[in-house]
Amino acid sequence: MSSFESDSASDAESAFSDASSDFTPSSSVKSKGKVPLRDSTNTTAQPSAPATGDASDQYQKLSQLEHILKRPDTYIGSVEKTGVEMWSFDAATESMIYKEVHIVPGLYKIFDEILVNAADNKIRDPSMRNIKVNIDAENNTISVMNDGKGIPIEIHKKEKIYIPELIFGNLLTSSNYDDDEKKVTGGRNGYGAKLCNIFSTEFVLETADLNTSQVYKQTWTNNMANLTKPKITKLKSKKEYTKVTFKPDLSKFHMEMLDDDILSVLRRRVYDLCGTVKDCNIYLNDKKLSIRNFKSYVEMYVNAIRERSPDPVAPEGETRNYSTIVHEVFNDRWEVAFAVSDGSFNQVSFVNSIATTSGGTHVKYVSDQIITKLIDALTKKEKGKKKLNIKPQEVRNNMFVFINCLIENPAFTSQTKEQLTTRVAQFGGKPSEKIVISDQFIAKILKTSIADKIRTIVNANEDKEMSKADGSRKSRIKNQVKLVDANKAGTKEGYKCTLILTEGDSAMPLAVAGLTVVGRDYYGCFPLRGKLLNVREASIEQVSKNAEINSIKQIMGLQHKKRYTPENIKSLRYGHIMIMTDQDQDGSHIKGLIINFLETSFPGLLEIPGFLLEFITPIVKVTITGRGNHRVIPFYNMPEFEKWRETEGTTCKWKHKYFKGLGTSLESEGREYFAALDRHMKSFHALQDGDSQYIDMAFSKKKADERKDWLQAFRPGTHLDPQIREIPISEFINKELILFSMADNVRSIPSILDGFKPGQRKVLYGCFKRNLRSEIKVAQLVGYISEHTGYHHGEGSLAQTIVGLAQNFVGANNLNLLQPIGLFGSRAAGGKDFSAVRYIHTNITDLTRVIFNPLDDDLYTYVQDDAQTVEPEAYLPIIPMLLVNGAEGIGTGWSTNIPSFNPVDIVANIRRMMNGEEPVDMTPWFKGWEGDLERISPEKYKVSGKIEQVDDDTVEITEIPIKTWTNSVKEFLLAGLGNDKPWIKDMEEQHGINIRFVVRLSKEEMDKSLRMGLLERFKLISSISLSNMVAFDPQGRIKKYSSANEILKDYYWARLELYQRRKDMMAENFQNQLTRLSEQARFIKLIIEKKLTIANKKRSEMVDDLKKLKFTRFNKNGKPVHDEPLVEAEELAEEEEEAAGDISQLNLGLVAPEDESQYKPETTYSQYDYLLGMAIWSLTRERYEKLLRQRDEKQEELNELLKKSAKDLWNSDLDDFLVGWEEFLRADIEARNSFGPTAKTSTRKRARKSTKSEPAQKKTKSSTPKASTPTIKAEATPAQPVVKEETNKQPDLLSFFSKEPSVAKTVSAAPPKRKTPKSKPKKEIVSLFSDSSDDDITSFSVGDAKPTPKPSTNNILDELEDLKSSTFTPKVGAAGRRRPKSYALAESDGNESDEDYMSE
């Protein structure tokens, strides 16, 4: 007990033995000129003078000893018996018990002071092993003895008395007054043991000092008023000790004896030492206590709690270890244990062995950490919730915290030391000695019942919060302005009423119009604003603040957590809900969300038959227009309409109208619908077994894997039976809601064929349809695409899609299909920093039409949207753009993340597959990126930037991980430069062509960074995963691919099949031209030989003659007509003029009629126009001979085509692509190396240049493609040069015949072009269906037209050279790549307007 409570003046040693001889101090111990303290008289022992009543008698001066005895509560607490609930030790059961005891706090405190002194000695002398406490209640005697160093037995140099007497018999003496010395003992103010002495009738001190080999013993009596001379004897053993024995002055505490209550508390305090003093044996009444450490000490409390509150049952599927103590020794100074309390916060804490029964800053600091981390951990488990709806105090009330800590120079609220006041920052210790609650500690706590208790509290709070928005059955609701309330709602007949929930405000007029039919007594309407919240995993905050849900609850009168049955449904304002949404996928989703809301919050409602209804309206109305068969057929879903169109729709004439939304219908139609309410109203079947599981699968975030299986099992054509009157919820989910989920995935997941999502596909289709050749404002292009491609979403999203297709900074597209003419975003912000779309321009790039070959356009299947033909279901470019540019997206149940790869590697693998070889593994590649890729697993790559140390205190960052943007790195560096503990001295940005951050560090931080690794310290490492490559396969099914080569293989076979179809189409077109030329030659020959006369004949007579001569008929698409029945001209006489106007507006190539069934068949007349439309001057023998030569040439071209395989055609396209790719890379390098004000100008020049094509006969093999489409050479023999279009036209064969529309006229049918300067050469017209009756009949070359590439300038270009020279033996030119008739276009000179040739 080393001079108790730090009261010793020096470290000395003691021993467990009595002195063998007496020792009498000499008179020299008395100081000169000063009376020793032991000889002074305590003034408290003298009687005070009686008061005389004057002012002097009213004001007294007391000595400190007198003050302590008169005002003991200031020093030791109350000296009156006080009833208080606290932990005590039950000697009978030998266990802790929490009960109300009546004790005198002052008596407890003086005992505690002696006990703490004994514990403090363990800090001074770690070799101390024993503390022995004896409590003799009968004799009112308490003794505390400890081994270890004793009190120095020597004379104090200044006070001239023995040090033991100084520190135990004189106030304000201590060794703790040096505040510069950091101590973790309990003594602090110099009172301690003296207070015990003062409040004792007898106080005996005994200590042994090994240094002097003496034993010191001294006795004080009469409240420290009297003392004996010290008895000093010789120490016989070599063990030091200190022992204090005292008899409390029970009269001062108004007690007669030590009763059971105070004894139980004193015994508990002795047990406290078992837990707080490490490696020390604790004895009580000569019995060694079995508690060995803090954890076993805590178990005594937990066992007591368990006896009062048995363990609850753990939730199913979870493990709860309620009885185990969560205990951790964090460091030498902090030891913490946790248990679950029984409803109120409990703490048992010790500071330097002092029992802080009222807690303090140390308890708050630890418990606050536990509470915060508990809430955070439970919040993470409750996905979708920002924070649990619980207050920290509510968590605290369920905690029992045990703390044993050492704090330097602790401060308390008073001398009683019940509450620590030391600030956290002054706890002291090294950083490693601070207390930080670990995640492992929290994880263990979560396995106790605290988690369940917190959830119970959260649920109660949420219920309380949700109840605030509860409705009630009242006749009028005043705060819902948009509600059209039923007159009977909220009355005793309210259960008969039906609330119609419409999809948005636009549908309200239709519903309100219907109320004029059914009346307003039992029907009300309310518009839903957008889609209802998915409440399944939503936080209570989200649900309680959701306006739509609160409105429904108020309007319906729903009360939170009330279980509704057919018996109590009369308590609602409405007895039914009827959903009235659009008949599209989004409408189905809204229905599903309402079902999900009811099943989650009010499941009883769905169990009531007829509660939930839906109102259906037609999505398509078909009007049969045939004579005597005029009728209207409504269709309520698209699969049903598509099936009808392919069957019955082919047998009659009809027209149709799409109803994309309820707002499309007229109010009169609304009244018509409600008049036939039974036909348009369907009910949902009451909840059946398994329905809840389907709802959970469709809407729970936890069921993502199940949704994947559900969507993979989908088959096109799936739809809900329109005849069913009562819809099972499972049927609705599996046959209607699934259509929305599939549509969501289609919007979010790309196709393997073209790598596009629908929005991107629409953009490209719109550019092709517009025949985009010169730059156009993005804002203008947005409007055009929105109008012509059936885009039904916001134009802002469409603009972002266009910008995304044009972005070419590092980390964006490897191959941008649109030109970024302007500021389209940068690597700094990941492209989000693009300029307003009204300022930036775009155009298709040179390579776009090389990759998306026009010859394929007629081979695609095009989507029908609202009676309009729009983009193809999927393009099939000559290389897989999904691998070239990669893709990311999040759909329903599925997401995708596909990195980009090098087009050179892709082409090489395609050619390997052409040669029957297996493709080799490809590594992700990003144009312009110079970082490092390292494969760390089959499905993962490590992505590293570049950083190097340039001198002792400087590093340079010259590359960052791909998809990490410059601004993010800058933010990280600035945070290191300016936070509370900056580790960066300075940072500069010196970006030029490439990234360059220059960062300066201190020597210490540089050393630390080098130890950690520069890449790691500066967070220049990320990863690329190949484990989530999802796309729609060629059959339109969602598929997860395991590798890039698996994607390539699926693409390869689809593309190869399309090449075969292209070849077949080209061969068929060549054959048709041969037939056409032959028939024209035969026609001219008959005219010349006068075997056929056309002059002075009626039109019908001429057609009859041609029929008899069996001339082949050709339809408007240039194909021969063989089997179609002829329509007699007489029957079509009236219809022909009307049809001519409509048919002339049809697109003759890509775009089909809006609805083919609305148009009349072709007439026989038009099918002979290729003969009767020939100019008169063509009827000559020269023309006849020329046609025969052209026929032979065409036959030769056909023979050349038939010699080639599909692979030959593909390889030829790949050759052209590689040449264009080389030029593309050169231009990209030049653009990135360009600086100054001329950069933008040069970009625009290139854009204009790309729209100008040289005449075909002037091109050489060394030239590279400049046009946005592959050039198709129109070659002619020397003897027969290509004839230009004549400006002076000859008279027509018959005055009422019009010359057959040439391809040039097809192009010019659109709005007139701006005039071209005369100096510009005329552009040749190239057509696969060249059918002009004059000399302008074009032949096609099948020779090798592969241009020679320019010399390579870098490694990428060298790879291109190697690839072109070493793979795939056959070398086939660009011969078969000809435009179909629909793409027969005059070359642009750059000044022409963009013509919409697809709409002509």
From Swiss-Prot:
Span of domain Toprim: 497-613
Highest classification ranks of the organism: Eukaryota, Fungi, Dikarya, Ascomycota, Saccharomycotina
Catalytic activity reported: ATP-dependent breakage, passage and rejoining of double-stranded DNA
Region (Disordered): 1-57, 1235-1400
Chain sites annotated for binding ATP: 117, 146, 174-176, 187-194, 415-417
CC per GO annotation: DNA replication termination region; synaptonemal complex
UniProt gene name: TOP2
UniProt source species: Meyerozyma guilliermondii (strain ATCC 6260 / CBS 566 / DSM 6381 / JCM 1539 / NBRC 10279 / NRRL Y-324) (Yeast)
Compositional bias ranges of the Basic residues kind: 1312-1321
Keyword set includes Protein biosynthesis: no
Protein name: DNA topoisomerase 2
Keyword Metal-binding: yes
Subcellular location: Nucleus
Note: Eukaryotic topoisomerase I and II can relax both negative and positive supercoils, whereas prokaryotic enzymes relax only negative supercoils.
